[in-house]
Amino acid sequence: MKFYLFSKRCMIKKIFLLLCVLKTYEFMTESERRQIIELIKREVIPAIGCTEPIAVALCVAKAAETLGMRPEKIEVLLSANILKNAMGVGIPGTGMVGLPIAVALGALIGKSEYQLEVLKDCTPEAVECGKQFIAERRICISLKDNITEKLYIEVICRSGDRTAKAVIAGGHTTLIY
């Protein structure tokens, strides 16, 4: 699998502004260079794949872990921005595109402690199980109404009479519920 770096928009803006003001790295003082390096270390984290579907997989993994068993049904409610940006994106290691496989794998093999590398344990067997999970129509993905957050992911996992919920909002790894 390929590894991608995830960088927050605010961090990119800060670096861009710093570089515009300071012109180039070679004209910076040692202190300014250290500040930029520290900013990058603070704001850049490893991710496998595009951050939107991987953040959804992370939220699903957290809800499934909270449920304590394999979910029978998964409901995913997303902000328009996440839905738009995640639907047509390839999921590394799967040969597939879109949210359904990210959701299925998040539930089946995802580990929330891996953050945006939540699917790093993906195998061909897991992908086949994910395809079956999708074929059984166990996943419902829809737009969350009345959300002002651009980044909002809500997942409800159900199995029998048990229910678990997880919510990410504001940042790709910011679990708020």
Question: What do these predicted regions represent?
Answer:
Residues 28-37, 68-82:
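Acidic-glycine-rich active-site phosphate/pyrophosphate-binding loop
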Residues 35-48:
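Generic N-terminal amphipathic, Lys/Arg-enriched alpha-helix
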Residues 71-115, 127-139:
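A structural-propensity feature for long, helix-poor, extended segments
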Residues 53-69:
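Alpha-helical support elements that line or immediately flank enzyme active sites
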